[in-house]
Amino acid sequence: MKLVELIKNLTIELQDGPLDREISGIAYDSRRVKPGDLFICISGLKSDGHLFAGQAIENGAVAVLAERQLDTGGKATLLTTPDTRSALALLAANYYGRPSKSIRVVAVTGTNGKTTTTDLIKAILEEAGKKTAIMGTLYAQVGEIQREMQHTTPEALEIESFMALCREEKADYIVMEVSSHALQLQRVAEIDFNVAVFTNLTQDHLDFHQNMDNYRAAKLQLFQMIKEEKQNYAIINIDDPWAEEIFQAATIPCRSYGIKKRSDYQAGELKIDLDGSSFRLHYGDNSLMINMKLIGLFSIYNALAAISFALQEGIDPGLIQSALARVEGVPGRFEKVDCGQDFAVIVDYAHTPDGLENILQTSRELGKKRLICVFGCGGDRDRSKRPLMGEIAAKYSDFCVVTSDNPRSEDPHAIIAEIIPGMDKVEKSRYAIIVDRREAIRHAIHLARTGDLVVIAGKGHENYQLVKDQVLEFDDRKVAAELLRGKVK
């Protein structure tokens, strides 16, 4: 593709060099530049791409897009534009031929529940015979082709590349998790979404957004960017405190789901135990009984979001029932670890105050004898949620083991010291501090007796632990299983 074609509709402030150069690819990481590429200088959270333009040119870049004038030594065409991050989204879409226009794209956003909801939507669509791609926290996949993802929502270049692959594979739908980071950083700015699904909004990522107003504003962008076309709409959790604001901000028709408030798709007759959940869905003059292996009130909310979408798409109710009955669950989301012990062990990704409260409240309602919770808080992330999570853990648990999560560059002891004041607010609070996560899990399992429930929260599906600059092999599920096998013997 010629450079002049690639930059169509892009605001160019300065041009130094020819526009008839042939562009063979786009890169924003100088280490990945190949001969013939356009290199886009992105000012990131940790580094500035403008500092690596010279390296990109040495690696073969024939054009550079920047926010300020740079010396290319006459070896590459230099273009400047006000915002290279939004430019990356535009040029990636141009380069790959805007694949989202030819596939129905469903965006799922919210603090908690995105991964499970996308998984359930995919299961229902596939039950209905629709070829469905998925993109999210765990991976991106279409058919048998799977790509690992570095972020919940990757950079625009990776998104458009994957969507182009989905177009080649003739996918009918792409269901993707859309994070607040992606919305604020313009990663999805050029995608033609058809449906937006809202799960909930609670405190998270304030290390990035600074406050809840900014976090909320980032989420709202999704409901304002979808084109007002006949087949486009939003699905909203009406029980969430922020629902009304989304209804008012949305530029497309909205449908609601819920349990507590009157909604278009409403669940009643709820039953939850360690074998699964069931409920009756009421919509219009119709009702539908849903039985599934997923556990918890939060799982019912996720299922409601997926069902509401499916019914809006005109999918047969019987197919919805059979799809949900078969779903085993998402790795690391309220996942049982069973080695024949006479007490229950659950691993969950809950790493926000609301997420932790959801799983502990559900665990408490399961009616087991004692609830033992192992948890910590991530380093280099929103510090204000640490005492909140401590208070929640102490409120619902009979005993807590406070430990490391992913401490990153922070001292694990310092993180725990910010958790404890929240726990001390709870009069009945009982806890132990064991910084080593493996030993913390060992202690919780050692304490467990017949009929108890141990919840290991925070890391879920993750198979690593981030300590300083190291990525250590660590999987809560494997560690728990190994320790349980030792105890059962």
UniProtKB/Swiss-Prot annotation:
Pathway recorded for this protein: Cell wall biogenesis; peptidoglycan biosynthesis
Residues engaged in binding ATP: 110-116
N6-carboxylysine, modified sites: 219
Chain segments annotated as coiled-coil in the UniProt record: none
Motif (Meso-diaminopimelate recognition motif): 405-408
Its EC number(s): 6.3.2.13
Post-translational modification: Carboxylation is probably crucial for Mg(2+) binding and, consequently, for the gamma-phosphate positioning of ATP.
GO cellular component: cytoplasm
Cofactors, names only: Mg(2+)
Binding residues annotated for meso-2,6-diaminopimelate, in chain numbering: 381, 405-408, 458, 462
GO BP annotations, alphabetical order: cell division; cell wall organization; peptidoglycan biosynthetic process; regulation of cell shape
Compartments where found: Cytoplasm
Residues bound to UDP-N-acetyl-alpha-D-muramoyl-L-alanyl-D-glutamate: 30, 152-153, 179, 187
Catalysed reaction, written as an equation: UDP-N-acetyl-alpha-D-muramoyl-L-alanyl-D-glutamate + meso-2,6-diaminopimelate + ATP = UDP-N-acetyl-alpha-D-muramoyl-L-alanyl-gamma-D-glutamyl-meso-2,6-diaminopimelate + ADP + phosphate + H(+)
Keyword set, alphabetical order: ATP-binding, Cell cycle, Cell division, Cell shape, Cell wall biogenesis/degradation, Cytoplasm, Ligase, Magnesium, Nucleotide-binding, Peptidoglycan synthesis
Single annotated GO MF: ATP binding
InterPro entries: Mur-like_cat_sf (IPR036565), Mur_ligase_C (IPR004101), Mur_ligase_C_dom_sf (IPR036615), Mur_ligase_cen (IPR013221), Mur_ligase_N (IPR000713), MurE/MurF_N (IPR035911), UDP-N-AcMur-Glu-dNH2Pim_ligase (IPR005761)
Protein function: Catalyzes the addition of meso-diaminopimelic acid to the nucleotide precursor UDP-N-acetylmuramoyl-L-alanyl-D-glutamate (UMAG) in the biosynthesis of bacterial cell-wall peptidoglycan.
Family: Belongs to the MurCDEF family. MurE subfamily.
PANTHER family xrefs: MUR LIGASE FAMILY MEMBER, UDP-N-ACETYLMURAMOYL-L-ALANYL-D-GLUTAMATE--2,6-DIAMINOPIMELATE LIGASE MURE HOMOLOG, CHLOROPLASTIC
Official protein name in the record: UDP-N-acetylmuramoyl-L-alanyl-D-glutamate--2,6-diaminopimelate ligase
